[in-house]
Amino acid sequence: MSSRVLASRAAQPLKRHPTVVGAGDEAYPTPRRCFSSLHDRTVNQSADFSSTSKNYDRLGRRAKEKLLDREFFMSLLNSASTKREAKSYLARLKAQQPAKPQKKLQSTTVQQTIAESLPSGVNLGSFYGASRSVYQSPVFRQDSTPAPAREDIPERLHLALVKIKTPQLLDDSTLDGVARTLSQINRLGLACCVVVDPGSDGDTHTLRKIATEQVGRIATAVDRQPDSKSSHLYSVLSFPAKRPDIPTVSSRKQLLSPLRDGHILIVAPIAYTEDTPKALMVPANDAVLALTKELAGLATMPDPDEDPMITAQKINDLQKEVSLDRVILLDPLGGVPAFRGPQTSHAFINMDQEFEHIERELLQVRNPANNSQGESVVTNPISDSNAVSESASTEPTSTPAKQALLPMSVGEDTIDGHLDNLRLSQQTLAMLPSASSGIITSPVEVANSARSLESSPSELSVGTRRQRNPLIHNLLTDKPLLSSSLPLSRRARGSLHLPAPPTTFVKRGMPVSLIPDPRVQVWTAQTRPNMNLDDPHVDLPRLVHLIEDSFNRKLDVKDYLNRVNGRLAGLIIAGEYEGGAILTWELPPGVEDDGSESSTARMVPYLDKFAVLKRSQGAGGVADIVFNAMVRTCFPNGVCWRSRKDNPVNKWYFERSLGSWKLADTNWTMFWTTPDLPEKPQKFRDYEAVCRSIQPSWAEDTGVID
């Protein structure tokens, strides 16, 4: 049935006409040609025929399938930042599909041998050929015996572990939206294992009853979704006799079988004792940790008498079976709030860098009496595990008015809930590969963004775009909804289509090294470090590789070292040289570097190189980590840099800078984060002069006009 027929019927009432019945479809009246505006056709088609509308049952089977596909791909495209990201994910998903084995290869060998022995072009049947028994009889050969065909190795299962807290407090509409999102995630190739968290209000019997009821309720909501099936388990966890206080997974096969069959698995936090079977309630967080340990392949108890190499191989084989890619915490509290600094929430948390700082911040809000009266800044150690440097990220405390409101507006239970989510995310990601990530958001946020096209505005109507689904967006992009390096003014909720409550994207992350350590020596023109890029603390070959890989150009290392050595302000290195920044102090042309106060005052903080490895670009938050360290810790009073006018990264720079200026008669655009720079004419001219005068240090001419 064509969309024109649907649109015409929805646009205006029609008189009865003879009906035309097609195979597999219902009977529909054949309408006369009638015309309506394109706007009316679009709106009514979306409203009258959606998977949740009353008219949905009137559609034929093929029409229903097309409509469901349309809703699925519309949700897919709206959840990605760009169509390129959605296309990229679909390409990765297609690449994961194994090639079909050639089952008929062996059976065709005999037929091919017979055919080759016969005269070409003539089918003489079996009369002139040898009998089948001759071809199939054993033959003595000195050739090596072909190895038997190896059974197909099961495809690696990509999995998301989801915890839903207090689903009994969610209405049916919200739960249906969550189930719709889980169904879409499952369709995108990420199997879902859901753990029900009934909370802690009530005795053991009451909580067990609530958990059992909610498992069935969630299963019903999942089964209502098109092409979606659920399975639920009540006995997958157990308490071993040796460790009666720590739950473990009793059967790995029982856990993985429904997931491999494409079912959404729902687990109740109930464990059974091994010695005398008895059902006991388990804290949902402990259940999540037990499942994570099993799915990560770390639950195997090594035999002391077994060869360590054999034990390692067993663990490796288990890890090849399953890839736990996401740990999703759906909590009515939403993401992790921020009580210090200008931001109100954490869009992205780099656990290696920020966990202890955020945990301490939440504890200070929970117990304000324990805070020191004279505290005015919060110290954020950039990398406790890095031997080269540790940085103190100093952010101003919140305003007195904000501090006064915190104890009244935020209760201890709320802070405890956020602490539990933060710690659970840290503990689970610590057991998983660095590529895995976590999401902390609210069920309401997921349900609202998963609404059907029925409630969506017309594509032609005036308004903001549909709200992105945080779970699908993260699956497609491996990035948070809002970049953590965006200025606060560009992260504020200006419309109803930004997340509220916030969503927090969590990665195990990477350490960040700042050289020199700003906590020991602040980066100022008066305290320039006496260091060069060939300093022992700097791995120069890896730094050069980072720059060349990021810019896709060969660096003239000797010329570059001659230019920046003696001018260095410092270096920012993320992880194992996955990203970094080189910052210098530059003097405008004509100003003599004589060490005087007037000369030092004219020095410009300049971002000379900002680089991220290609494999880390666009995902993982490496660029955000480096940029945040630069503007919040190293140069909080401002820094400038330049970029080619046609650089595709300029959009990213525009969003994060406080201003930009196209340099006339050049191919450069100048950016800065210095507050009120246009109101300071001398400093502005110095910034412009520096950006104009610096000469590139590339080894060959690639045709790029600098």
Swiss-Prot record:
Source organism's superkingdom? Eukaryota
Alphabetized InterPro entries for the sequence: GlcNAc_Synth_fun (IPR011190), Vertebrate-like_GNAT_dom (IPR006855)
**Pathway where it operates:** Amino-acid biosynthesis; L-arginine biosynthesis; N(2)-acetyl-L-ornithine from L-glutamate: step 1/4
| Presequence range in chain numbering | 1-35
> Is Amino-acid biosynthesis among the key words of this record?
yes
**UniProt domain N-acetyltransferase: residue ranges:** 527-696
Q: What does the record give as the reaction this protein catalyses?
A: L-glutamate + acetyl-CoA = N-acetyl-L-glutamate + CoA + H(+)
The family line of this record is: Belongs to the acetyltransferase family.
Q: What does this protein do?
A: N-acetylglutamate synthase involved in arginine biosynthesis.
Identify this protein by name: Amino-acid acetyltransferase, mitochondrial
**Organism of provenance:** Emericella nidulans (strain FGSC A4 / ATCC 38163 / CBS 112.46 / NRRL 194 / M139) (Aspergillus nidulans)
Underlying gene? arg2
